[in-house]
Amino acid sequence: MSFYVFLVLFVFSVFWSFYRHLTKYCTFFLRMCRKVITFAQKFENCAMNDIPSFNSYIVKTIKENWLLDALTDYKGPTLQYHDVARKIEKLHIMMEAAGIQKGDRIAVCGRNSAHWAVAYLATLTYGAVIVPILHEFNGEQIHNIVNHSESRLLFVGDYVANIIDEKEMPHLEGIFNLPDFSLHTCRNERLEDAREHLNLLFGEKYPMAFRAEHINWHIDDPEELCMLNYTSGTTGFSKGVMIPYRALCGNVDFCMMRLGMYLLKFSRMLSILPMAHMYGQAIEFLFPFCSGYHLYFLTRLPSPSLIAEAFKEVKPHLVVAVPLIIEKIIRKRVFPKIQNNAVKLLMQMPVVSKKVKERICQEVYQAFGGEAYEVIVGGAPLNQEIEKFMMDIDFPITVGYGTTECAPLIAYSDYKDFVSGSCGQTVDHMEVKILSNNPSTNSISTKAPT
């Protein structure tokens, strides 16, 4: 009986190995032959110093992908790129009515959503400074950040709207509800009037319909301040990090050149990490949006079951995660299936172990949706046991490193070049120096081009 079980497992593993390699080579062939090339390849001289402005990325992707799906709230509505442009333009009308000037601060605080992304993009393309706030912060922390940043407007999600007190933020002129951009609080009569008659004002400005050629948004300077990002901090209130457009350009440019070559034009990505955090914001939001991909947002607390369900339905072409997410998926969905005597016995057989590992790798691959080019881990070191397991089965995983100040990338390597226990190589546009003769126990300094 055991012989037949072994035979079935062996035949099945051979079949899966053949199927996996056939799919891999077919996909590679299609990528080599496709006429649709990546955004980075189309952007002539796509080095950071040659980019006219960061907002040109946003304008270009909207115009070129006008009728394609852009932002989707998981199990919710979808915005196409032209829908995003219309909403941005309407927010610009209200910002102008409120008297917002270039360089004024606008804060956003809420769970990941399509409208969070729209508020962010509208702020940058207007020329204002975005202040993303982690929705996990309590009311007092949010009040402090809004006041310290001198924000004039605030966009909030449903949960945040219930924990803040507008009286504690006396300089705010308006608070918008993210779900529908309605006014939660308004201290500016012109803003209130503009919101009430928004569709009329939009129709008067664009009587023959709003089209791509009407886009005329703020052209930024590389050294211009675009963001105040308040980190969680280790003591006291959060510390604000001043981020110029140059930093966003460098990160998006690097991702489009290094990752864009492996992702098809109509790729999908799933936004799990907090968008207010620089890691999720740059890699899960700005890079895919500027590349014309379709983004899905988890608008609820990302529990392991919800993440697993979303991976299965969305089937993202690139997975970006923190170690905790990877560890939970492996320990809860993979280890229970393979940590039994039968599999352990097969793993010890020299001839069979390779096929068994390939089958296990395919099982793990399916847990992440089955279509991802690679899984990028960052934010903290990956558990050594999990990393060793992933490397043993040849799973496409890599670990990167960064900080908020660098927006965020400092180091990254493609999974094919990843060395276990490392966090990649220095990314383009960056310089790294170890400030010690004993590099394993000291800090590093980084420098980007000026």
Predicted feature locations:
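Conserved AMP-binding/adenylation subdomain of ANL enzymes
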Residues: C249-R268, M275-C361, E371, P396
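Structural core segment of the AMP-binding/adenylate-forming
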Residues: T23-F28, F39, V59, A98, ...
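A short helix-loop-beta submotif of the ANL/AMP-binding
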Residues: R105, R111-V131, H135-G139, N147-L153, ...
